[in-house]
UniProtKB/Swiss-Prot annotation:
CDD domains linked to this entry: homeodomain (cd00086)
Reported function: Functionally required in R1 and R6 receptor cells and primary pigment cells for normal eye development.
Tissue-by-tissue expression: Abundant in the eye-antenna imaginal disk.
Stated name of the protein: Homeobox protein B-H1
Superkingdom of origin: Eukaryota
PROSITE patterns recorded: HOMEOBOX_1, HOMEOBOX_2
An example Gene Ontology CC term for this record: nucleus
Record's compositionally biased regions (Pro residues): 513-522, 561-576
Organism of derivation: Drosophila ananassae
Gene Ontology biological-process entries: chaeta morphogenesis; compound eye photoreceptor cell differentiation; eye pigment granule organization; eye-antennal disc morphogenesis; leg disc proximal/distal pattern formation; negative regulation of transcription by RNA polymerase II; sensory organ boundary specification; visual perception
Main location: nucleus
Amino acid sequence: MKDSMSILTQTPSETPAAHSQLHHHLSHHHHPALHHHPVLQHHYSLQQQHQQQQQQQPPAPPAVATTTVVNMSGSTTTAANLKPNRSRFMINDILAGSAAAAFYKQQQQHHHHHHQSHHNNNNHSGGSSGGTSPTHHNNNNGEGFEPPSGGAGAGAGAAAPPPPLHHLHPQSHPHPHPHPHSHPHPHALVHPHAKLAAGGGAANGLNVAQYAAAMQQHYAAAAAAAAARNSAAAAAAAAAAAASAAAAGGGGGGGLGVGGAPAGAELDDSSDYHEENEDCDSDEGGSAGGGGGGSNHMDDHSVCSNGGKDDDGNSIKSGSTSDMSGLSKKQRKARTAFTDHQLQTLEKSFERQKYLSVQERQELAHKLDLSDCQVKTWYQNRRTKWMRQTAVGLELLAEAGNFAAFQRLYGGSPYLGAWPYAAAAGAGAAAAAAHGATPHTSIDIYYRQAAAAAAMQKPLPYNLYAGVPNVGVGVGVGVGPAPFSHLSASSSLSSLSSYYQSAAAAAAAANPGGPPPPPPPSSAAAATGGSPSPIGGLIKPLAGSPTGGMPPHHPSRPDSASPPLPLPLARPPSTPSPTLNPGSPPGRSVDSCSQAQSDDEDQIQV
C-alpha cells in the first residue's frame, strides 16, 4: 500500500474545486459514530482541517496531491505522508500514475453524481461501470443486515468497532434504497490481519484506518472470488460492501481512486490491472491493490489483479495485461530448432502416415535424437497445417465446381455480365471455339489442377485464378493453331510452381489434340485475351487477330524470364480491345499475361 499510495501522490490531483465539493458534501453528513472512537474523532478533526486547507488553496493543482481517503466513519488519512519501501522503478509505476490521474477525474464526477442524487453514503466509491448502477452505493440507509465476521473490525481499524457502525448514520434524506442488498457475499470477509488492525488501534494513530482499509483491499480478491462485483462503500461497512458488491452486476467499479486506499473498495479480480507494485507475498498491508483507479472500469473479463490472492490465499503473480495471462512468471521453453536432417525425416514419415503410434513415435524420436514430446508436438503442428491446407484445396475445388456450373449454365464467364467488354469476351470465346479448344477443356484442366494441388497438400495461391478461364485463343505466331490449342488452355498451369509440373503435363496429355506440352511457356504466347480472371475481376483483352497479338520471338521464352511488356509492344494499336485493364494495379501493362504469370510464380512459394 505504501508503495502504490506514494506513487499516486505523485500524480497531480483534480483542482481543489473538486476537492472542496467532495468535502462540502462530506461535511453535511453527521457522524455519530465518531463519538465512540477517539481515534476516529482525531481523524475527523484532521479531515476538517484538511478540508479548510483545500478550500483555501489557490486553483493551481498542488505539487503533491494530498488526496483524502474518506473512510466509512468519515475519518480521513492523507496519502502524502507515506514513503515507498522499495526503490525499484517499474513500468507499473507509470501505469499507476496515468491510471490514477484518469480515474481521479472520473471518480470526482461520480462523487458529484451521487451528491446530486442524495445517496446517503459517506464514501462515494466510484460508480459501478461508469455510474450505471448508482443504486448499489446507498450503504447507509439503515437496511438491517449484519456484517460478516471480521468485516467491521478489520474494516474500520479502530480497536473494536460495534458491528452496526454503518447504521448510525442518521437518515438525512428520505431516498429509499431501490435495491435491497439481498445477495450474500460469496465468501465471508474473514481477514487474517484483522487482529493486527484491531491491536494497533490506539498506537498507530493516523495510519490505523488506512492500514485497515489496506487489509480490506488486500484480501478483497480472496473474499470475492468469482461473482461479478462492484466496488462497495466504506471500510467499516464491510457487510454493505459485500452485499452491494455482490448485487452490482458485473461492474468493474472503480474504488475511490484518489488516494490509493479507497476505503473498502473491493478489488475486482476481473478488472484490467490493479496497480500493485509490491510483491504479493509481503505480509504488510502494503500490497493493497490499488491506488488510483484501483479497480478500473476497463475490461471485466481480463486477467486477475496483479497481486490478487486466490481463495487459498496464495498469491497470484499474474501479468498486468491480457497477453501475460495466468502464470506469466513461468519461463516459456524456447522453440525447438530442428536440423535439416530431422525435418526431412519427419516430413517423410509424415507423408507416409499422418498419425504415429506410441511405439513408432518413440522409435522416430530415438532415431533423430529428439525427445518423445518433441516428435509428438511436431506431428500435432504438422497435422494442423496439413488440415488447413487440405481445407484450402477443397475450397478451391468447390469454387472450381461453382465456376464450371456457371459456365455450363450461361455459356460464358459469370463475371463478365457486368463488364462493358463482354463483347470482347464473346469474341474470345468464339475464337477459342474456332481453334478447337472449348471452354470445358479449360474447366476440366482447372479441376485437375485443383485436385492435384489438394493431393499435393500444398495450398494453391489465389492468384491461380488469374489464369483460370484461359479460353484458349491459341495464337502462336507462325505455328498452326491445332498443336497449341490445348497448350493455351493449360497455360494457366504456368502459375503453378515446378512442384506441379508433372500434374500439368498429365492434365495436358489428357486433353484431346496434340502431344503433351513442354513446361508451359508464358500464357502471353497464347494471347489469351477476352476472358476474365475471377478473383481480381481483371479483363485480359482479346488480341484482335489470330496473328496480331504477340511479337514472334515471344512464344519460345520461358515464363519467368519474360519481362513485363510495354504497352505499344504488347498490342498493336489496331486491336479492338479496351486500352485499360479495369481491375489491375496501374503499373501492370495491359496484355502482358506473362507478367501476371510471373507474379504468380513469385507468390506461390509457401
